[in-house]
Amino acid sequence: MEWRYFVVIALICPLIIVETLAVSDCVRHVSESARNTVCDVRQYRVTKGVEADRYVQCFMTALGFADESGSIQRSNVLTALDAVETHDGVYTDAVDVCLSKAKKLPGTERSGSFFSCMLRTESAQNFRDAVELQELRVASKWPEGERFDRSKVQLMMRELNSQLRC
């Protein structure tokens, strides 16, 4: 009977670790040689390659925008966009187009494809805002009930990027 508890704990513990992953952890797990790639992604420069895909997958998962297999979590992305956009639903078409493109790719490339696609849409600024606000929320640096304030978010992100050497 005791071995069953061990199996359950062994299966649940990795899930708990994945859920508590922060974006800063994704940066720390990247090799020093890939630091410029990470910084390019954090500055919303479209960057391709294995290191970029790996980092984007990690931070999209940390934000709750993707699952571990690379599948985009549409409802989470839309909820984050709702938090920064006053015109409800303007960005839904962009999310759906990018989601459709990403679904056709292997799991390791989906998050990067979706991220890059969103940066090429009319909703690019809203997507950036949503990513940044969500990163601050996940890091417990933004009170959950506080309304979005672009200038405050941008200031906090500059400080965070500076700490991450980006």
UniProtKB/Swiss-Prot annotation:
Localization annotation: Secreted
Signal peptide: 1-22
Principal subcellular localisation of the protein: secreted
The keyword Signal appears for this protein: yes
Any one Pfam family match given in the protein's UniProt record, by short name: PBP_GOBP
Disulfide pattern: 26-58, 39-166, 98-117
SUPFAM superfamilies (alphabetical): Insect pheromone/odorant-binding proteins (SSF47565)
Keywords attached to this entry: Disulfide bond, Secreted, Signal
GO MF term set: odorant binding
One CC-aspect GO term: extracellular space
Gene3D superfamilies documented for this protein: Pheromone/general odorant binding protein domain (1.10.238.20)
Domain of life, per lineage: Eukaryota
Family membership: Belongs to the PBP/GOBP family.
Biological role stated in the UniProt entry: In contrast to the related D7 salivary proteins, does not bind biogenic amines such as serotonin, noradrenaline, histamine and adrenaline. It is hypothesized that either D7r5 evolved an as yet unknown function or is becoming a pseudogene.
Name of the protein in its database record: Short form salivary protein D7R5
Organism: Anopheles gambiae
